[in-house]
Amino acid sequence: MVIMQHEKMNDERNLTMNSTKVILKDASYLHSKTSITFILKGVVIEEDNKIYYFDTSATFEDQEVEFEFALFDSDMDNLKHIEYDNPVTEIYFIEPDLHFTIIDFNQELLCIYIDFDSGLRHSNMATESGISLRINVAKSDFTKFINELASLH
């Protein structure tokens, strides 16, 4: 299930903007309480790059991990043109805080691993090690989620 909400908000630079919340929920969310949420905080232009800053949270049962995440123009362009490689597709971003591993078992649901780099989160050193959050979703829901994120570009 994908949810997109718009809210009016002020960011730390005292600019008023419409906040956009994009949520991807596990197909069994009522039981697993597993989801990832991106809330657009602001957009900044630095050195000819447009950077989209998000407050991001991942939930699993009664646990929640919150962090700031940045997507660059090129990340957004890549999301708009994503192509699936069977059976495994990887989506990486310039900021290595997280990436997606998509596994298509040719069944009703995709298996999405959202991989968090704990080395980067704790020591500002990319390590490609950390926790992964597994979300099972219909391919149409994941495509809608990616399109909602990319539409912010």
Model feature map: region roles:
Residues 42-44, 58-62, 71-75, 116-120, ...:
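Beta-strand elements of well-folded, non-transmembrane domains
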Residues 87-129:
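Amphipathic protein-protein interaction modules
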Residues 49-88:
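Short, well-structured hydrophobic secondary-structure segments
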Residues 81-90, 146-153:
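Short, surface-exposed secondary-structure junctions/capping segments
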Residues 6, 10-11, 25, 103, ...:
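Intrinsic disorder/low-complexity signal
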Residues 2, 6, 10-65:
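N-terminal domain-start interaction segment
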Residues 120-153:
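Mixed-charge, glycine-accented linear interaction segment located at domain edges/termini
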Residues 32-41, 84, 92-97:
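Charged, amphipathic alpha-helical segments
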